Amino acid sequence: MKMSDNKQALQVAALKNGTVIDHIPSDKLFTVVALLGLQDSDSNITIGNNFESKKLGKKGIIKVADRFFTDEEISRLSVVAPNVKLNIIRDYEVVEKKQVLMPEELRGIVKCANPKCITNNEPMTTLFHVIDKEHGILKCHYCEKEQSKEGIKLL
């Protein structure tokens, strides 16, 4: 491509097969990497941050070769980056687009903020009910403590 073509070069290389996670808020990019355990992955991974975005101002993007995420993994994303979009790529073509949506329940993802909650004192899996998706309000199934997504700690 010549510079005189008046076209912009791709900032991130094309992906043959895998998943593109797009529209990640820039300040949440590395949280998403950690949530999905990508730091331990053997796949080729491209991570870009602070790309211009009309919706977010600045955004992050992650391209993971030959990896397709489970619904459980996608649910984890909804806690920190609820408006992320996933593009499923096969043979360089987008074959499916998924909007990350917060599920009705979050199991084993969030730590309860109540120090007296049984999940903080016994070896058991946490369970939260999402009572307000728009504002990210979660309620512990066991002690019924409510917490907002801004104050949560991930497991």
Swiss-Prot record:
> Which biological process terms from the Gene Ontology are attached to this UniProt entry?
'de novo' pyrimidine nucleobase biosynthetic process; pyrimidine nucleotide biosynthetic process
User: What residues does Zn(2+) bind to?
Assistant: C112, C117, C140, C143
Q: How is the cofactor bound?
A: Binds 1 zinc ion per subunit.
Task: Mention any one GO cellular component term assigned to this protein in its UniProt record.
Answer: aspartate carbamoyltransferase complex
Top-level taxon of the source organism: Bacteria
Entry-linked Pfam families: PyrI (PF01948), PyrI_C (PF02748)
Per the entry, which co-factors are needed? Zn(2+)
Q: Which residues constitute the signal peptide according to the record? A: none
User: What GO MF terms are annotated?
Assistant: metal ion binding
Summarize the protein's role.
Involved in allosteric regulation of aspartate carbamoyltransferase.
**By its UniProt entry, which HAMAP family does this protein fall under?**
Asp_carb_tr_reg
Name by which UniProt lists this protein: Aspartate carbamoyltransferase regulatory chain
The gene is pyrI
